């Protein structure tokens, strides 16, 4: 597992993807709760 030079490690991709998904879900629920996300 030493040839990860030049590529992004898979765990970084998974972590970033998880944060983005959680952020998008949080924004969606917050927007729909406050009445601003009805256009989404």
Curated annotation (Swiss-Prot):
Gene3D superfamilies: 6.10.250.2070. The chain crosses the membrane at residues 8-28. Pfam families: PsbJ (PF01788). One of its GO terms (cellular component) is photosystem II reaction center. InterPro entries: PSII_PsbJ, PSII_PsbJ_sf. GO terms for biological process: photosynthesis. The keyword Mitochondrion does not apply. Keywords: Chloroplast, Membrane, Photosynthesis, Photosystem II, Plastid, Reaction center, Thylakoid, Transmembrane, Transmembrane helix. It is a single-pass membrane protein. It is found in: Plastid, Chloroplast thylakoid membrane. Disruption phenotype: Able to assemble functional PSII, however electron flow is deregulated; forward flow from Q(A) to plastoquinone is slower while reduction of the oxygen evolving complex is faster, loss of light-activated, redox-dependent phosphorylation of LCHII, plants senesce quickly. Plants are hypersensitive to light, cannot grow photoautotrophically and have drastically reduced oxygen-evolving capacity. Dramatic reduction in PSI subunits, almost complete loss of PsbP, a subunit of the oxygen-evolving complex. HAMAP family: PSII_PsbJ (MF_01305). One of the components of the core complex of photosystem II (PSII). Essential for PSII function, it may be important for unidirectionality of electron flow and/or assembly of the oxygen evolving complex. PSII is a light-driven water:plastoquinone oxidoreductase that uses light energy to abstract electrons from H(2)O, generating O(2) and a proton gradient subsequently used for ATP formation. It consists of a core antenna complex that captures photons, and an electron transfer chain that converts photonic excitation into a charge separation. PSII is composed of 1 copy each of membrane proteins PsbA, PsbB, PsbC, PsbD, PsbE, PsbF, PsbH, PsbI, PsbJ, PsbK, PsbL, PsbM, PsbT, PsbX, PsbY, PsbZ, Psb30/Ycf12, at least 3 peripheral proteins of the oxygen-evolving complex and a large number of cofactors. It forms dimeric complexes. Belongs to the PsbJ family. This is Photosystem II reaction center protein J. It comes from Nicotiana tabacum.
């Amino acid at each position: 597992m030493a040839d990860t030079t030049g590529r992004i490690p898979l765990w970084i991709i998974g972590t970033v993807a998880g944060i983005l998904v959680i952020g998008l879900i949080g924004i969606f629920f917050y927007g729909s709760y406050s009445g601003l996300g009805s256009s989404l």
